[in-house]
């Protein structure tokens, strides 16, 4: 699998850039501002979350090219 991978929670406004099997960035909009949270998966639940993101489990879906440009500029 090539990285980065991009996912979102369908209908919830949370967006993810997965850099590799142990790192991801979560982005959401709060009061009109992009809020960014970087996560390094060190514990098992975090590692499982990245696997769920990559496998598109639950409500995780791929982001469109327009969404990627909007939520992860630069």
Identify the residue ranges that each predicted region occupies:
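N-terminal helix-cap/turn-to-beta initiation motif at the start of protein domains
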Residues: 1-5
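Tryptophan-anchored aromatic micro-motifs
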Residues: 6-11
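Intrinsically disordered, low-complexity regions
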Residues: 12-14, 33
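Broad, structure-driven detector of short, well-ordered beta-strand segments within folded domains
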Residues: 14-20
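Basic/aromatic-rich interaction segments and small domains that mediate binding to polyanionic partners
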Residues: 24-36
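Low-complexity intrinsically disordered segments
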Residues: 34-74
